[in-house]
Amino acid sequence: MNSHNNFAPPEGEGNIYEYRYYRLAVGSAGAWIGHFKDALPHREKYSKLVGLWHTEAGQPNEVSHLWAYPDLNARADARAGASQDDAWRAFLKKGGPMLREMNSVLLQPTNYSPLQ
C-alpha cells in the first residue's frame, strides 16, 4: 500500500476507528484520491483522518482510509455533519460514480495497542 498522507494517530486515548476500503473503477484510483484530497479539509471539520492509502499490488484499484472517533456517537455526528457539507457533497458527486464496492469496519484497539 502506498500512503497519501502522513500517518497521524489521534491525541489521547479511548478512540475507536473506522477502516473504510473501496474498490474503484479500473484506472480511476488516482482521480478519486485527487478529488478526496481536495475535499479532505472540509471532511476533517467533522473527524480526523488517520491514514489514506492505495494498493500497488493485488487489487490495484483499491483505496483505504482510517478515521478516528472518540466513540460511536461522535462517528454518527461526524457522518451526519459531513453529509450536510456542500464541499463534501460535491466530492461525493465526483467520487461516488467511481466506486464499485465499499466496505467499512469498526475497530476497537486492544489494551496494548499504541492507537488507543
What kind of region is each of these model predictions?
Residues M1-Q116:
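Short S/T/G/P-rich N-terminal loop/turn motif that feeds into the first structured element of a domain
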